[in-house]
Design a protein with these regions (language model features):
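Bacterial Sec-dependent N-terminal signal peptides
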Residues: 1-26
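Interaction-mediating elements
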Residues: 23-146
Length: 146
């Protein structure tokens, strides 16, 4: 009975650890979904994709790319952007909901969006002045951190 308990604990530990192991591997730009390549061509004109990788973790699949200007972008398996980090310039305003962009333009006229993360529930933004803003799915501001 003691051996069975130990075996059960070992099996349980192995299955608990499985989601933490991710398969990350570089891929060719042509292996990216067309939606990702089109997004980059539309909103990051003048840059090229310097590096691309796919990450498989349990049921999560995402694409990560680095552009020639140092920008880092992440996309889900459907090719929708989930995170954008810019080094020297603003996240393109055309991809930010107009209600959020207007709030930032009015409230922080000298700042721009350096980073944005988005999922079905939230938009999290980091501005060039160091403020971190969180908006809910209704585009209502719900948190500010400095």
């Amino acid at each position: 009975m003691l051996i069975m308990k130990k075996m059960f604990l070992v099996v349980l530990a192995v299955f608990a650890a499985l989601p933490t192991f991710a398969d990350e591997r570089p891929i060719q730009v042509g292996q990216l979904p067309e939606k990702v390549r089109s997004f980059v061509a539309t909103y990051f004109e003048g840059t090229t994709i310097e590096f691309a990788q796919i990450e498989n973790r349990a049921s999560l699949v995402q694409y990560e790319i680095v552009l020639s200007d140092g920008s880092e972008l992440q996309f889900n398996k459907q090719g929708k952007w989930t995170e954008i980090k810019r080094k020297k310039s603003a996240v393109p305003s055309a991809i930010i909901p107009s209600k959020i962009q207007t709030y930032i333009n009015v409230t922080y006229p000298n700042a721009f969006i350096k980073e944005v993360e988005h999922d079905d529930r939230l938009y999290e933004l980091i501005l060039s002045n160091g403020f971190k803003l969180t908006f809910n799915s209704s585009l209502k501001l719900i948190d500010i951190d400095k």
